[in-house]
Amino acid sequence: MKIIFFDIDGTLICGGSELMSESTKEAIRIARANGHICMINTGRTKRLVGENLTGQVEFDGLLLGCGTEIEFHGKQLMHKTFSMEESKAILTAMKKYHVDAVLEGSREDYAPRGEEVFTETFRHMAREIENRKYDRYANAPGNYDKLYAYAETPAGMDGMKRDLSEILDFIDREQGFYEIVPKGYSKATAIRYITDYLKIPMEDTVAIGDSNNDLPMLRYAHTSIAMGNSSKQVLETADYITTDVDKDGIWNALRWLGVLDK
């Protein structure tokens, strides 16, 4: 039996679509029918996963927000959020270094409005922020899980790192964007948690991803598979490279793995 961890964006779905291909859904159905455990392992928080995604095909569990929330068969096993004190320190540093971010929580997201916005990039995102009905920073209670942040110059994010490196980890998503998570949490720590919980040996773990925030789980899992559309770092890290997400990448990955065999 294998336990297989799937990223979402660029791995299960592509191009801004929330729809999985028929070959992806069928591959997951067959793998589960053959006794293997299939789990989502994503940077998205629970609010951004939604039933329109998980309702397309059944998964055994969800590892969410880069390891900050874990569910198995609908039961929440753990959930890490920022404290009010940590939240205050984060917002203070963002203002100090002119860093914009969406504060991502399990139930609500928070985004800058008006004078809270520092960068042109986020000003251009104002309509999207309005459409998604993000709440204001001022209403953030502190119990959000992670941040998706942007700084127009490297100095801005460097300042955040200097001030907050004891409580935060920073994942470079390129072009000035960063995923920022509580210190010590990642897709790899999520795998460690769930495999310890289920008492599954490491040699049975498989991770499939495409982007830099997948690197921790790809390096941690016994077997790592990169989508054909992966970043350079991911392609250099993986044990196997499958085809692109829109070219039956998941089907071909699971076929190579042998979990589709009867």
Q: Where are each of the predicted segments found?
A:
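Active-site phosphate-binding/coordination module
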Residues: 19, 23-118
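Short, hinge-like loop/turn segments at secondary-structure boundaries
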Residues: 56-59, 79-82, 118-123, 187-189, ...
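Mg2+-dependent phosphoryl-transfer enzymes with acidic/Ser/Thr/Gly-rich catalytic loops
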Residues: 1-3, 21, 179-262
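Short, structured coil segments at secondary-structure junctions
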Residues: 55-58, 65-66, 163-167, 220-221, ...
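Asp-based phosphoryl-transfer active-site loop
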Residues: 2-17
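Conserved acidic, metal-coordinating active-site core of Asp-based
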Residues: 93, 97-100, 104-217, 229
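Short hydrophobic/aromatic-enriched beta-strand-loop microsegments
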Residues: 59-65, 80, 170-172, 224-228, ...
